[in-house]
Amino acid sequence: MLALKQALSLVSTKVAGGAAWTPTDEGKLEAWYENKVGITRNGSTVSDWADQSTNSRDMVQADATEQPAYNTVTGDLTFDSSNDTNLQTTSQMSFSADFTLGIKMFPTSTNGTFVADNTTANELFKISADDAITIKIDGVTAILSLDTGEFDDDYIVLTRVSDVFTLYRNGVAQSNPQTLAGTIDIDAIGIRRTDVNGFDGTIQEVQIYSISNATLTANINARLSTL
């Protein structure tokens, strides 16, 4: 794993002037919920995770009983399905073409939705098994499985290029791409419509783009590997 992280750090593209890549370098960045940044706390929980893109799609939760817990050291947001903890934005994101989602998370149970829509039904990304992610778009389902092992404290990238989804786990593309067309709708972290299939575990960062290419995937992997 150390060798993998070192290799990924070497592929991180530099922008003009020699600065390290960040998601805001991408013109097609739709939302960025950055680790340890943009957090509004309500005691030990999070009421607002501010979007670090220019789109102001903050993820918020006014109900204190549904706010995820926050770890000030790691930047972990802990979600608990028994309390329906979640964050939502009023600015729904919709993607009918290429798409990339990067996330650093540690699921502790299955059937948990990490990113989805709590306004439109049948739109979700969830941990459906110890080794599988289910994607549902416009009510149609695809399942992306790991080649080996089970989900743990991982950084995950999901790409869609010409309607073909690929799952990357800790920088490694898994060998079971799936075809799934339709319009992806997203407005929530940790829950789907209506307030079901809540996520159990921690989430450190979420990045969402309306584009996908190999360089972007490498850069996301390189960044998430450092968290």
Predicted regions and their residues:
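Short edge-strand/loop segments of extracellular domains
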Residues: 52-54, 116-124, 170-173, 226
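Short, aromatic/His-centered strand-loop micro-motif at the edge of beta-sheets
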Residues: 134-156
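Extended recognition patches within non-cytosolic domains
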Residues: 5, 10-29, 41-42, 174, ...
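Beta-strand-rich interaction surfaces with strong enrichment in secreted/lumenal proteins
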Residues: 90-92, 143-148, 178
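Extracellular glycan-interaction patches encoded by glycine-rich segments
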Residues: 136, 183-204
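Localized edge beta-strand/strand-to-loop motifs within extracellular or lumenal beta-rich domains
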Residues: 107, 150-166
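Extracellular glycan-recognition modules
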Residues: 41-44, 48-49, 58-136, 164, ...
